[in-house]
Structures are given as C-alpha cells and as structure tokens.
Amino acid sequence: MIMRKKVLIIDDEVDLCLLMKSYFLRKNYEVYIAHTLADGMNRLNQIAPDYLFIDYNLPDGLGWERLPEMYQKFPHTHFHLISAFRPTMPDDLDGSKLTVWEKPISLKALDHFF
C-alpha cells in the first residue's frame, strides 16, 4: 500500500486553508487544517506531517516562535512559513529548514515546489 504524504496547514484564514486543501487533495496528499496555534500544535503532535505550513501571525501566538521546538521534535518535516509580508527572522532560527511564502500564495508557485 502506498502511503500518502501528509500536509498540516495552520492558518486563521479559512479561505486560504480551503484553497490549499483543495490543491493538495488534487495531488493526493492527506490534508489537515488548524486555525489556531494551540490546535495546530496538537495536530502536529498527532499526525507528524511530511509538510507543515504555518502562518507567521495566529490569533493565539506567533507561528515562527514555535519553529525551533518543531525542528527538534520533527526533524523530517518540511517547514513552510506563511506571511503577509517578508518577515525578518531571528538569528537563532535555522532558515535552511524553512521555506517562506508571502500571501497571497499562488498555486503556480506551489506547483514549482510540489
């Protein structure tokens, strides 16, 4: 049996989540969505996704602040930070493990990556 790759999207913008979910379902990924950092962390621990998309600014915290912890716990996950602006990342955050996407994310741009 072929295992489908898993994608977790943590973003409070419902429309963006639905668009990305539709995109990844068409590519035969399993897709999970969370709209808060707390819910996203719970889902992350439950499913250990292959790909994580996390919004920079969520209602209950800043997504990038949790990235070092996520890197350690999930070293095989590919991390993608979503932001409405090009953020300045802290020096202690390993940018080599991270792809930054600026909103709005185009499906064409995703096609170049996935």
Q: Regions from the language model: what does each represent?
A:
Residues I33-Y51:
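Acidic, metal-coordinating helix/loop segments flanking the phosphotransfer/catalytic sites
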Residues I82-A84:
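Hydrophobic/aromatic residues positioned on beta-strands within the core alpha/beta folds
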Residues I105-F114:
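C-terminal output helix
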Residues W64-H76:
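Short amphipathic alpha-helix used as the core "switch/output" element in two-component signaling
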Residues D11:
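Conserved acidic carboxylate
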Residues D55:
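Active-site residues of response regulator receiver
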Residues T36, L62-E65:
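Acidic catalytic/metal-coordinating carboxylates
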